[in-house]
Regions:
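N-terminal secretory targeting modules
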Residues: 20-156, 160-181, 359-368
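Conserved beta-strand scaffold positions in the cores of enzyme catalytic domains, especially
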Residues: 155, 197-199, 318-320
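Residues at the starts of beta-strands that form the adenosine-phosphate
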Residues: 152, 196, 286-288
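Short secondary-structure transition/capping segments
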Residues: 104, 210-213, 331
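A generic structural signal for short coil/turn motifs at secondary-structure boundaries
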Residues: 17, 67, 258-261
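Conserved SGNH/GDSL esterase-like catalytic core that processes O-acyl groups on lipids
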Residues: 123-128, 166, 171-263, 295-301, ...
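Alpha-helical cap/lid subdomain in secreted, periplasmic
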Residues: 222-367
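Bacterial Sec-dependent N-terminal signal peptides
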Residues: 1-26
């Protein structure tokens, strides 16, 4: 009788253990249940990207979630757990090394009775490295993550759009830890409209001339065509993206006019029109584009307005920021770049223009 009881208990233990093991799941980063926003490249089950602001959503039923990844340098990511991107992140994680594992969520199993959704957003830019996600692991099961919004805004920019130094004080120098793309005018404007945001931005880049440099072919006009910020190939194919933006916003020119210099007007205008043509080739001739003029230089306004007026392309709009759009003390972060307060003020300026161009109604939504 004792032997029989032991045998039954052993069978029950094996059954329970098998049940627990059966509920654990590992999926490749390319699994269709994971939702990505931004330019990525899928290869052999892994997903690679380096543009700032790329984000993903993954949903699971279980008590833990980890991700296996590699990074060519060191990046920082915002992590939201059962929350939204208009809130402060629940944690910030660093990605580095080859084939490393990061635990994003862990809670006692008895409390894991519902589905959890994790949002993971790259807060640093391409110069900090390329991240490759290999697989996700949970002790439960994966379910379909939230899909993208019906509204999508594309932003092309420089350090302002990257969120360079947004979390630093105006007396601090830049460090990668203080860069946070989520605290930019771009993300604030997109959130106001309930839109997804796709960002191509790199600090120091211009239309024809980069910061403290000469006229160069390595500029945002060229990089916009690439899948990766840090590599010329492969070329980006919008047809494979799955998302088509409703509007593209360009916020470039500051670096062209940096350190008391600027390119010849004909060179700048030629490159700016080339960027406009690239956008139209991606999304169609009627695709709307909003060209923002930074507040720094009146000559820059003349250059960009000349490009808009002479491009002979439909749906190209113009917005010049006033020098008083934000102040240079309380609204500033590292190295003369706006903090979150300054970025929200820029968002307040651009939102009415996006509303007019797209037909999206203004609302009482907070700008955050």
């Amino acid at each position: 009788m004792a032997n029989r009881i032991i045998g039954v208990l052993a069978a029950v233990a094996v059954f329970l253990l098998g049940g627990l093991q059966a509920r654990s799941e590992t999926i490749p980063a390319t699994d269709a249940r994971v939702s990505y926003i931004g330019r990525t490249l899928s290869d052999n089950g892994s997903v690679s990207f380096d543009w700032t602001g790329v984000y993903l959503k993954v949903r699971f039923e279980g008590s833990s979630l980890s991700i296996r990844l590699s990074d060519s340098k060191k990046n920082y990511y915002n992590v939201w757990i059962d929350s939204s991107m208009d809130k402060a992140p629940d944690q910030v994680v660093a990605t580095f090394g080859n084939d490393s594992t990061i635990t994003l969520f862990s809670t006692p199993r008895r409390k894991a009775k519902q589905a959890h959704q994790i949002i993971l957003q790259k807060r640093t830019e391409g110069s900090q490295g390329r991240t490759t996600f290999h697989e996700f692991v949970t002790d439960g099961v994966f379910v379909q993550a939230d899909g993208p919004s019906e509204r999508v805004i594309e932003f092309i920019g420089d350090s302002y759009t990257c969120g360079y130094g947004t979390e630093a004080s105006n007396k601090e120098r830049f460090s990668p830890e203080t860069e946070n793309q989520n605290l930019t005018y771009a993300c604030a404007a997109a959130r106001y409209f309930g839109a997804e945001h796709i960002v191509m931005a790199h600090s120091g880049m211009g239309i024809a001339r980069n910061y403290n440099g000469k006229v160069t072919e390595d500029n945002m006009t060229a990089r916009y065509l690439n899948t990766f910020d840090s590599a010329e190939s492969p070329a980006w194919k919008p047809s494979e993206a799955g998302l088509k933006p409703d509007i593209t916003v360009i916020y470039l020119g500051t670096n062209d006019f940096s350190t008391g210099m600027q390119p010849a007007q004909r060179v700048f205008v030629k490159n700016y029109i080339q960027l406009l043509k690239e956008i139209k080739e991606f999304y169609g001739e009627e695709h709307p584009v909003l060209c923002m003029v930074p507040k720094h230089d009146i000559l820059m306004l003349e250059y960009i307005k000349k490009a808009v007026d002479t491009c002979s392309l439909p749906g190209v709009h113009f917005l010049a920021l006033s020098p008083s759009v934000h102040n240079n003390e309380e609204d500033m972060g590292a190295d003369g770049h706006p903090n979150y307060s300054g970025h929200k003020k820029i968002a307040y300026t651009v939102i009415p223009c996006i509303s007019t161009i797209t037909g999206w109604e203004l609302s009482t939504n907070p700008i955050q």
